Amino acid sequence: NIYGGTYSLFHEYFERWGVIIEEVDTTDYEALDAAVSGESVKGGAHGCPAKAVYFEVLTNPLLQVNNVTAIAGIAHRHGAIAIVDNTFVTPYLQQPLDQGADIVIHSATKYLAGHSEVNAGLVVVKDDELGKRVYFAQNRLGGVLAPNECDSVRRGIQTLALRMDRQQENARAISSYLLLHPLVKSVHYPG
C-alpha cells in the first residue's frame, strides 16, 4: 500500500544496492517496532536495526491514514529517522515536521503545482544537519529545478488552499454518493 514509483525505487534499485527493505503495516505498531528494532524476520536475519522508516501520511492507492507522531516515535526510539511523504495531504492540511518527522517529501507535480505543467518534488528537513546531507546529495546528483519550473510551483501554491478545500468538498460528495450506491462494494475515503 505505497505509491508504485516508490515501490519500484525501493525494490528495483535500493535492494540491488544492498539496502534492506522491509515492508510493514504502519498501523500495526508492534510489527513496526519489531521491524525497526531489527527483531523481525528480515531485520533480525541481518542483525541490524533500521536506519530509516519511510511512510505516506495517506497511502497510495488505498488512502490508509498513518499517525505521524506514533510512527516517528517508534523510529526515534530505535535511532532511525522518519521520512514522510505528505503529497496527498499537502502542507496546507498537515505539517509532519511538527509531528516528529525528520524529512518530509512532496511530489510538487501533484497538488502543490496543481496544473500538470511541472515535474518536481521537494524535500523539507527538520534541522541543519539533515539539510546539509540533502544538499550534498542534491549538489552531486544535480536534482535542481530550473527557475521557470520553480515559478510554476510558486504560482500553484498561491491557489493551493482554494483547490484543496474544493477537492475535499468534491471528495465528500462523491464518496457519500458512492457509499449509498447498490453496485459499489467499497469506498476508500479517509474523511
Give residue spans per PLM region.
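Conserved PLP-enzyme active-site core in the AAT-like
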Residues: 1-183, 188
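Conserved PLP cofactor-binding pocket of PLP-dependent enzymes
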Residues: 191
